[in-house]
Amino acid sequence: MKKTTIALAVIAAALTIGPQVATAGTLDDVKSRGVLRCVVSTGVPGFAYPDASGAWKGFDIDFCRATAAAVLGDASKIKAVTSTGKTRFTKLNAGEGDVLWRNTTITFSRDVGVKLRFHGVNYYDGQGFLVKKALGVKSAKELNGASVCIQTGTTTELNLADYFHANGMKYEAVTIETNDEARQNYTSGRCDVYTTDASGLAATRSTFSDPQNHIVLPEIISKEPLGPATRHGDDQWSDIVTWVLNATITAEEKGITQANVDKMKSSKDPEVLRLLGVEGSQGKELGLSNDWAYNIIKSVGNYGEIFERNIGVNTPIGLPRGLNALWTKGGLQYSPPFR
């Protein structure tokens, strides 16, 4: 009887300890390693791409850098773990990366079935179609019989099938795995159409020698809320990634920028003081230093600065804010309060 009681007590203790160890795992691993590993795309202009020197840049990369700034105090301490649409979740769940900052749509099956935890939307998007002007097409409903470049392992693959079926059309699928492969097949004429998120189409078109000869058709056929993800089972790490994104949005709401963040430490706005770590203990509650959000803004800026620098109207990508404007300016970007 005593042996049975002891055995049950040991099992109960093990079950109690287990989750606590898992919860602290990723943060401790990143701090010990001194480098944050971000699962990113193989290369999408404006979002995640290596420059001439091999340094990774872009919208998603800046959010990776923001996370490193929050956790390690140094935005440069990152490693880009490249992935295709097929391999991105496998690499994250296998522990090859710490967080996924990649053009990835939040869906029920990915959240529940693939065992990912999503942390808000850093880009509101939708699926579109890119065609050559010479094709003479003005609407996606004129694409019956077209050959279409489509990336495998993506929501766009399923959306395409649904859209053509619903409109009584047929198509030839030209399957590809990377954006570069799609670009090559599209420009060579192997496919008449390239379909993916509209932001990705704008990014791809910006790399053409004759972008004016290509158009994105007016139809947007899906909702594609893109956001960061982590593995299930690590609540502390989930909280950190969630509030990294929220910090950049709140900073824009409050008018805090890379240029004025030091001055804003003397603000009379209590929420600004909490965000920048002048007051409160929010950094400690996350397991970070109290200046974690200050480090983000000082290193990469607020959400608007990240957007405009990488993909905004004054870049080759040329994307307007649209749905990604702040809620106070007609958009959907909105952060819960820092309270």
Where are these regions (language model features)?
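C-terminal functional modules
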Residues: 280-339
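Sec/Tat signal peptide C-region and signal peptidase I cleavage site
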Residues: 17-24
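Bilobed "Venus flytrap"/periplasmic-binding protein-like clamshell domains
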Residues: 37-46, 56-71, 105-106, 125-181
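Extracytoplasmic small-molecule ligand-binding "clamshell" domains
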Residues: 24-25, 31-101, 286-291, 296-299, ...
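Extended ligand-binding regions for polar small-molecule ligands
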Residues: 62-65, 69-71, 134-137, 141, ...
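Acidic, polar ligand-binding/catalytic clefts
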Residues: 65, 69, 73, 77-142, ...
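Cleavable N-terminal signal peptides
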Residues: 10-12, 22, 30
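Bacterial N-terminal signal peptides that target proteins for export
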Residues: 1-8
